[in-house]
Amino acid sequence: MKSYRIYLLFLLLAAFSLYGCKKTDSGSGDFDVQFAVPESVTISGDAGTFKFRVLFGKSPLSTDKVIFGDPSGQLNTCDIVSVSSSEFTVSLYKGMVSGQYNVYIRRGNLKKLVGKMKVTIDHSGGSTDIIVNPEAGSTVYGVVVCNGKRISNAVVSDGVEVVKTDENGIYQLKSGKKHKYVFISVPSGYEVMSEGILPKLHRQLVKAPAVPERVDFALQEAPGQDNHTMLVFGDIHLARRTGDQRQFRDFTNDVNDYVTANSGKKIYGITLGDMTWDLYWYSNSYALDDYLKDANAINGLQIFHTIGNHDHDMMYAGDFETVTKYKKIIAPTYYSFNIGKVHYVVLDDIECKNTGKGDADSRYYNESLVQEQIDWLSKDLAFVPKTSTVVVTMHAPLFKDNGNLSAGNGSSLVDMLKQYSQAHVFTGHTHKVYNVDKLASDNIFEHNAGAICATWWWTSYLTPGIHIGQDGAPGGYTIVNVDGDKFKWQFKATGKPVDFQFRTYDRNTMSFTAAKYVPDASDAYKNQFLLYASDYVTTSTSNEVYMNVWNYDPSWKIEVTENGNPLKVTPMRANDPLHLVSYTAKRLNKNAKPSFATRDTRHFFKVKASSPSTTLNIKVTDRFGNIYKEDMARPKEFSTDIYK
């Protein structure tokens, strides 16, 4: 269910008078006004107004009225105080209470029901009674409160400057308002209000750079954060194509099931970027707003967001203007927050070099942390004790899977993070799963955490029941359990139990011929298939078994026995055969380029058995002692059906 939590403290300064309530018994009728009525909203008890989103450009007239039919049956008529093509604002009536409301629009004697809305009135505290004056040179200022209590030492930033609230909960920023927003680094033990899945930790700035403006932040208490779970969501790539929205519902259902099963624990979520696909913002009319509609199927979960390269607007040249929509709709492109004993930092390591032509060929970017962001991070971390644990999320990887630095300016990030007791870096972008453990040398562990969409939603679209990435890892997410400063994590495949951690293949039963897998392809595409499938084109009598252990790191242990005798486990690089036949072959068979073709991976292993028909006992133990097993009866058939 959608849940909008709205804190409109700054609107209270506007001179909007509240319209009186009266019994309304108008006739019913129809006229062309359309707007979205959220299923559920939370409104501050101090809020004097509420905004509705206009649909299809069908705005009301300023003389129309909005009527709230309250739980007692009373019809309460409210003025419309401002209207645009995208939204309109109404004055809320005095004495509004929590409950289920029918929402009507009225024009003259015509009235029509638009929707039903559950309203929760939040009286957790406000700050409009606190007098705050800007200091000399301050252009953004305000107070941070919770339940009427002023919160000191809360960190606030405009993306350039970083300050803390004083003993009275007041902050003062000498801001140039470059990013046109201000955000709070949510302090430990607190949360901000939510609007659906979005934690509303930033506010838009509306006045000229030199004109002081007040922005307050209201927090709510969140006890028990020291023991919390963070669900980490890699690339999503919703674009209204390849059945992605239907498949995405499988993911949202999976997350809802997990949250329900662990209802006694503090759980949050965070994305790793590429929630959308910029090319299809325009060609398929699916953009950031549409993503939020689909993602709001997730219940009771605040989801922080990281920006990816495909969340930039390619219709603009350069970098700065490409993120304007993202900053207004989703979140700042970089910011921080605290949960329990962990300081979380969200970074943007995509530096766009767009030409602004608006086509795929004009889309250029560097995977790099620009210096301005490094400077901001240095200021942010100055308030974080070196004994703390820091978690960083960004879209493109910090390290390659061989451990070498990948991100531009990555050495600056490493130099800052290694000063802390430990740092975990979660990244996406590759649609692969791999880990880089540098805890011993630099106090850093990077998790390149795969993709919700796996192969951009293609494998399940072409081969229903198979949802895997180019490295054979399933589409899914990472469950990070935090107990104080102790971290444990597991990869969770969508729709699978959490103990599904590897897949096995019997090499003896695989023979990937062009005649079998790409019979309709041209000779050129058949030859391409044979290149991708070169390890599997001939029947083998080697008695080898391959294992794809996607979340493997060097602290894992893989043991295989045959008739009680241990077999030598050998690392290898290989193309995942299931991905070959469920995606690459099916594209080639249609004489189409496999844009997301199978890629070899480092998380493959093999053993050599003594016989083609013995059962192998496979035991995989992760770094935390969790054990995953398969008793592999052989010969094991290779077909997509057995892996569904």
Set out the residue ranges of the language-model regions.
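Bacterial Sec-dependent N-terminal signal peptides
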Residues: 11, 15-42, 112, 118-135
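Immunoglobulin-like IPT/TIG beta-sandwich domains and homologous Ig-like subdomains
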Residues: 29-113, 159-161
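N-terminal active-site segment of His-dependent metallophosphoesterases
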Residues: 131-139, 146-147, 189-282, 644
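Short, ordered, surface-exposed loop/turn motifs in non-cytosolic proteins
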Residues: 61-63, 137-160
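Short, acidic Ser/Thr/Gly-rich low-complexity loop/linker segments typical of extracellular
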Residues: 157-175
